[in-house]
Amino acid sequence: MSLAGKEFKLSNGNKIPAVAFGTGTKYFKRGHNDLDKQLIGTLELALRSGFRHIDGAEIYGTNKEIGIALKNVGLNRKDVFITDKYNSGNHTYDGKHSKHQNPYNALKADLEDLGLEYVDLYLIHFPYISEKSHGFDLVEAWRYLERAKNEGLARNIGVSNFTIENLKSILDANTDSIPVVNQIEFSAYLQDQTPGIVEYSQQQGILIEAYGPLGPITQGRPGPLDKVLSKLSEKYKRNEGQILLRWVLQRGILPITTTSKEERINDVLEIFDFELDKEDEDQITKVGKEKTLRQFSKEYSKYD
């Protein structure tokens, strides 16, 4: 894939806006169903400010808010990129996954909540799927995504939080397509969620999407990058969040971030207005490796 302007080109030739607004983390409902009016307003502001990529998921419980915001703003459907994810459950295989029979059925239900006929990208949220816990294995789960794509319910399909082994299980199977995206936690303090996953994904033409890209300044202080980011912020006349997001982008990775503040929304969109020198990009990469910060998916901490 390649970055051209404000878009990445996926391995299947389709394009994806190069930064996404996330509706998880602080907006994650954790089981309650009350409509989040603040999120609706924030999404409307983000869309009106120029965001064209909204990242959602079944487990976040925010699809109705996304749908309402889209309707209120009134953009042409083709001009907005919507991501959804199948709730596959956690690493304990405890049965607490999607209430729907399979990923295909889950997407159809999510589309009703979104008020849409299709999503632009549909992902398996976690690889924790087995015949015992779900009634189908990981490869069969992928075939449900292929069915959704073939029927026009999802324009692109991919995965999230997959290891090399997980990816190989799909790539080595006799499937009709391969994932175009692997969405993982990625930041300067976590440059591989699991061993070798970024390089391997990119070698296979799979775009890495990064959640948690601002960890070094939101949860990683004090840290070895503090002085580096301060100097680069002064050099480029950009704030430290913009420096980190631009670094992610220049690594060929799509950053996902979120905020409720108007100035921060505009800050994110300005990462396309400057470029880090190669030596500065490399310095962030090198110094970032001096610390490990894992904000999510703590089951992967065995690799730290």
Curated annotation (Swiss-Prot):
Temperature-related activity annotation: Optimum temperature is 50 degrees Celsius.
Oxidoreductase keyword on record: yes
Active site (record annotation): Y60, H125
The protein's enzyme class: oxidoreductase
The organism's place on the tree of life at top rank: Eukaryota
A Pfam cross-reference name: Aldo_ket_red
Binding-site residues for NADPH, renumbered to this chain: T23, G24, T25, K26, D55, S160, Q183, L214, T259, S260, K261, R264
Entry keywords, A to Z: NADP, Oxidoreductase
Site (described: Lowers pKa of active site Tyr): K85
NADP is among the record's keywords: yes
Catalysed reactions, as listed in the record: (R)-pantolactone + NADP(+) = 2-dehydropantolactone + NADPH + H(+); isatin + NADPH + H(+) = 3-hydroxyindolin-2-one + NADP(+)
Free-text description of this protein's post-translational modifications in UniProt: The N-terminus is blocked.
Gene Ontology BP annotations: ketone metabolic process
Activity vs pH: Optimum pH is 7.5.
EC number: 1.1.1.-, 1.1.1.358
MF terms in GO: 2-dehydropantolactone reductase (A-specific) activity; aldo-keto reductase (NADPH) activity; oxidoreductase activity, acting on NAD(P)H as acceptor
Alphabetical list of PROSITE patterns matching this protein: ALDOKETO_REDUCTASE_2
Task performed by this protein: NADPH-dependent conjugated polyketone reductase with broad substrate specificity and strict stereospecificity. Reduces ketopantoyl lactone (2-dehydropantolactone) and isatin. Does not act on menadione, p-nitrobenzaldehyde and pyridine-3-aldehyde.
PANTHER family recorded: 2,5-DIKETO-D-GLUCONIC ACID REDUCTASE, NADP-DEPENDENT OXIDOREDUCTASE DOMAIN-CONTAINING PROTEIN
Assembly with partners or alone: Monomer.
Record family assignment: Belongs to the aldo/keto reductase family.
Name of the protein: NADPH-dependent conjugated polyketone reductase C1
Taxon lineage: Eukaryota, Fungi, Dikarya, Ascomycota, Saccharomycotina
